A protein has these predicted regions:
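Primarily the internal scaffold of c-type cytochrome electron-transfer domains
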Residues: 1-200, 208-211, 218-224, 232, ...
Length: 284
């Protein structure tokens, strides 16, 4: 942290209340989407502050330290090959943390010798929805946790999804009473077996023996009809405003600020950030 050249006031009254030798602190987060909206709609929102592009870059670099995605290896099977990957959570909390609008997901694509995409799971649409994600297609559904992804409509999404008193999916903090799914990546040292109920892993991940203690080990089964050389690229992607959460918010047609926010969001291109990328080559 850079040192401050000037002195700092320590109290509102008294003598000798200024001190030197202090450092400048920068508070970082991960919501570059909101910062981008502030920058592009400063006049409309009445924002006078500057420096949003620089803040976006600082937060973007900070986010890249949150987790590592690795391709552990590949193996051939009849009419398919399998890619094994591992995510390591480098933060001291669940990832994503905090407000349940946030989600982290894996986007994995495979191309053949001609550069044509033969498989893609986790493809993101322009509106922020994820192809194949059950909760993005139907508000009442939840995309389950996977230890093995076998088709393009299965997406590995790390998220916390709440239920209301009737057991229905909700994105409202007022209505939410429990989790239907909480497979957010656990921090190192976290043990599912001894975790209290209020921080427990919920859903299929609770029974996934490869999901615990800050890591998740999983695989993708890629169907192939012939031999060849295949390129694999996998991205761990962070989305601060999940599509399903926003769709729940946008159902409110009474509060004018909701419609204003929807207009700004719909015209914002930046909707996700890449945390980590891994590549590999497989010869079938």
């Amino acid at each position: 942290m850079p040192k401050i050249d000037t002195t700092v006031t320590l109290a509102s009254s008294g003598t000798d209340i200024r001190r030197s030798g202090f450092s400048e602190h920068t508070f970082l987060g991960a919501n570059t989407v909101m910062l981008d909206m502030f920058e592009n709609y400063k006049d409309f929102l009445g924002i006078q502050a500057d420096g949003f592009p620089q803040a976006i870059e600082r937060n973007r670099e900070f986010l890249k330290t949150a987790a590592d995605l690795e391709i552990i290896g590949t193996r051939s099977e009849q009419d398919a090959f399998v890619v094994t990957l591992q995510i390591t959570n480098n933060t001291g909390h669940k990832l994503p943390s905090g407000y349940p609008s946030r989600r982290v997901f894996v986007q994995l694509a495979v191309t053949d010798d001609n550069g044509s995409v033969i498989f893609e799971s986790g493809k993101i649409n322009d509106d922020g929805s994820i192809v194949g994600a059950d909760g993005d297609r139907d508000f009442n559904k939840v995309e389950p946790h996977y230890n093995s992804v076998i088709n393009e409509n299965q997406v590995l999404i790390y998220e916390a999804i709440m239920a209301n008193a009737s057991g229905e999916t909700t994105h409202s903090l007022v209505e939410g009473i429990r989790y239907l799914k909480d497979n957010r990546l656990t921090p190192k040292g976290f043990k599912k077996a001894s975790a209290d109920n209020d921080i427990a892993v919920v859903g299929r991940a609770a029974n996934d023996g490869n999901f615990d203690d800050g890591t998740d080990l999983f695989e993708y089964r890629i169907p192939v009809s012939q031999g060849g050389t295949y390129q694999v690229i996998a991205n761990l992607i962070y989305q601060p405003l999940a599509y399903g959460h926003l769709e729940h918010l946008f159902r409110d047609t009474i509060v004018p600020e909701v419609d204003q926010f929807k207009t700004i969001y719909d015209n914002t291109e930046l909707k996700t950030e890449t945390i980590s990328t891994a590549t590999s080559q497989h010869v079938q």
